[in-house]
């Protein structure tokens, strides 16, 4: 009985050690892969299109605001037949950014009071 118990403890120890090494290998591989993807993205990055500027050449080139990326929006200006595409921020995202900004400011005030 002691032999079975000793063998079981040894088996569990070896299994946990091998799985921990495998996880470390996976973490290192994921980290290396992530770094290479970031380097490729930085090399591929180009200048973004500012808000309210024409984005018809590339609809995915709109700049990011503080939290969200602007969207290339198509519309017809009043009294015109030509379609216009500009980078704009949707209203619901604008309101979410304002709420997040107010929450951040309020959090700073609380930190001053109790910090």
Curated annotation (Swiss-Prot):
The entry's note on the tissues where this protein occurs is:
Expressed by the venom gland.
Report the superkingdom from the record: Eukaryota
Task: State where it is primarily located.
Answer: secreted
PROSITE patterns documented for this protein: SPIDER_CSTX
Q: Show the InterPro entries listed in the entry.
A: Spider_toxin_CSTX_Knottin_CS
Q: Which residues form the pro-region? A: 21-44
Give the molecular function GO annotations: toxin activity
Q: Which GO terms describe its cellular component?
A: extracellular region
What is the annotated signal peptide range for this record? Answer: 1-20
> Is Protease there in the keyword field?
no
Keyword Cell membrane among record annotations: no
Q: Which family does it belong to?
A: Belongs to the neurotoxin 19 (CSTX) family. 01 subfamily.
Q: Domain text from the record?
A: The presence of a 'disulfide through disulfide knot' structurally defines this protein as a knottin.
What is the protein name given in its UniProt record?
U3-lycotoxin-Ls1u
| Organism encoding this protein | Lycosa singoriensis (Wolf spider)
């Amino acid at each position: 009985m002691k032999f079975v118990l000793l063998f079981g403890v040894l088996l569990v120890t070896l299994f946990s050690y091998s799985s921990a090494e495998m996880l470390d290998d996976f973490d290192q591989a994921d980290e290396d892969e992530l770094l290479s993807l970031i380097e490729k993205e930085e090399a591929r990055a180009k200048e973004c299109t500012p808000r309210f500027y024409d984005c018809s050449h590339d609809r995915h080139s709109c700049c990011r605001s503080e939290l969200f990326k602007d969207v290339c929006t198509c519309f017809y200006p009043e009294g015109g037949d030509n379609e216009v595409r500009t980078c704009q921020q949707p209203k619901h995202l604008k309101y979410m950014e304002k709420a997040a900004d107010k929450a951040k400011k309020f959090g700073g005030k609380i930190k001053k009071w109790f910090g």
